[in-house]
Swiss-Prot record:
Signal peptide: none annotated. One of its GO terms (biological process) is spermatogenesis. The keyword Magnesium does not apply. It comes from Danio rerio. Belongs to the MEI4L family. The lineage of its organism: Eukaryota, Metazoa, Chordata, Craniata, Vertebrata. It is found in: Chromosome. Disulfide bonds: none annotated. Residues 109-130 are annotated as: Disordered. The keyword Ligase does not apply. One of its GO terms (cellular component) is lateral element. Keywords: Chromosome, DNA recombination, Meiosis. Required for DNA double-strand breaks (DSBs) formation in unsynapsed regions during meiotic recombination. This is Meiosis-specific protein MEI4. InterPro entries: MEI4 (IPR025888).
Amino acid sequence: MEGKSASCPEGVVSWYIRTSRLAVALAIIKLRPPGGARQFTESLAERLKRQDESWKSKAEGLHEDLLHLRQELLLTRTLLNTRSSAGQAPGQEIAKVLSQDDTREVNSGTLQTCLPPTPPNSQKVPPKDRQWRQDHRLTKHVQFLQRLSGLRSGFEESLCQDGDVVWDSVVQLLDCVVEDFRQAHTGQPLRHPEQLHNAIQVVAQTLSPGGARQGFPVQHFSRVEDLLKEMVNLLLTNQQLNAFSVQDSLSDCLLALGGNCCITRTPLIQLLMSQIIQLAQQLRDACEKSREEHEHHQVDWVCYQNSFYLFWLLERLAQDTDNRVNQELVVRLETKAFPLADEFSLFSLYMWRIGGLFRAGDS
C-alpha cells in the first residue's frame, strides 16, 4: 500500500513533464512561419537586424542630444570666464552670443547663406526626413565650433578643461560631411557642396590653433584617421554619373584638411601614398599574370582613372614646406614606378614625379 502511494507522485510528475513538453512542441509548431527552417532563420535575423538598427539610431540620437547640451554648457562657462572690454554684464553677453547666428566669412562664402534654417529648440521639432536631420546636425556643430573659436581668449582654456567636447564635435562634424559623400557615392545628388567645404574649413581651423599645442586625444584622432581613409576610398572608387562634381568637391575638402591643418596633413599624405603604392602593386600583378598566362587580366580602371585625383592632391600638398613624410614611403613609391613604365607610363611618371617632389621638400 505504501509503495503504491509513493509511486503516485512520481507518476504525476512524469505526466506533468510529458504534458509540458507537448505544450512547448505545439507552441513551436504554431509559431513556426510557413516555409522551412531556413526561412525562419532568415526572418529572425532580419527582425533582429532591424531592432539593432533601431537601437543604434536611438543611441546616436541620445549621444547627439547629450553632446549639444555639453556644447551649450561649455559656451556658457567660457562666456562667464570672459570679461567684455566694454564692461558688458556676463548674462547679457551670454544671451547675445547664444542667440545670434554666426555670420563670419570663411574664404569666399558665408556659412549663413549655405546652412539651412535652424529652429530655436531642436527638442521640440518633430522628426523629419533623413536629409533634414543631417543638415541640422551639421549646422549645430558648425555654429558651436565657430562661436567657441570666436572667443579667442577662452578657446585654448576650453581645450584644456573640456577638450573632449570640442574634439567630439570635430569628429561628429567631419562624420556629417563624410555622410553626404557616402550618399553621393550611391548615386544621390550632392547638395550644397559649398556648405561641406566650409564645414571642412571650420574643422581645419579648429584643429590648427590649439590642437597641435594641446594634443589630440588618441580615440578621437583614430576616428579622424578612419574618416580620412573613408574619404580617400570614396574618391578612389566613385563610378557614378555625377562623379566629376563629387570628385572635385571631395578633393577640395581633402585638400583643405591636408593644407590648412597640421594635425591631419602628414597622415593624409601617407594615406594617399599608401593607396597609390597598393594600386601600383595591383597593376603590376595584373601585368605579370598577363605575361605568364598569355591572356588579358582585368584591371580596375575605375580606381586607375580616379588615382589621378590622388596624384593631384599629393602635388598640391607637396608645395607646403612643412612636410614630415615617412621617407620609406617615398622610396617605395619610386621603386614601384619602374616596373610600370612600359604598360602604364603616365601612372609611372606621376609616381616618379611625386616621389621627387617630396624628396625635394624633405631636403
